[in-house]
C-alpha cells in the first residue's frame, strides 16, 4: 500500500501548529461551556476586560511557537540557558533576520522567539498580579496564584527540556502542562467576563 510519503517522514511545523491549535480551541470551547453550566457568580468587581484576554492570547501565541519548536526539533539546539551559546541572541544568526519572512523557518530563531515570549508572558503575569492586589480584587487572588504556580512549573519544565536536549519525557510534560495553563487562563478570563 502506498503511504503517500515522498522521502520525507517529518510533519510540517505549520501543519503541526494548526493541528495543535484546533485541539486547543476545541478544549477552550468545551471548558467555557462547562464553566457556563457551573453558574459561577460573576457579580464581583473586575479588571479591565482586555487584561485577561491579552494573557490568554499570549499563551496561545506561545503554544503556536512551541509547536514550531517541536516540529523543527529546535529544542535540540542551543541547549543552554539563559544564553544561546555564548550570547543572548543565537550565534548562528543576525538580529535583522527576526524581521524577515523566513524567520519561522529557522530553528534557532524559533527557539529565540519561544524563549523570549516566555519572558513576556511572565512579565505580563506580574503586571496582572500587581493590578489585582493593588485594587484588592479578592475574587482573583486564588485564580491568579494557580496560574502563577502552573506558569512557574511550565517555565521550569521548559528550561529543563532545553538543557536536556528535548528528552521526550520532559517535552511531553512541558506540553501537557500547557493544557493546565490554558484552562486556568480561561477560568480567569471567564471570571472577568459577563457571560450568561
Model-derived regions, located:
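Polytopic transmembrane helical bundles with strong interfacial aromatic enrichment
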Residues: 1-196
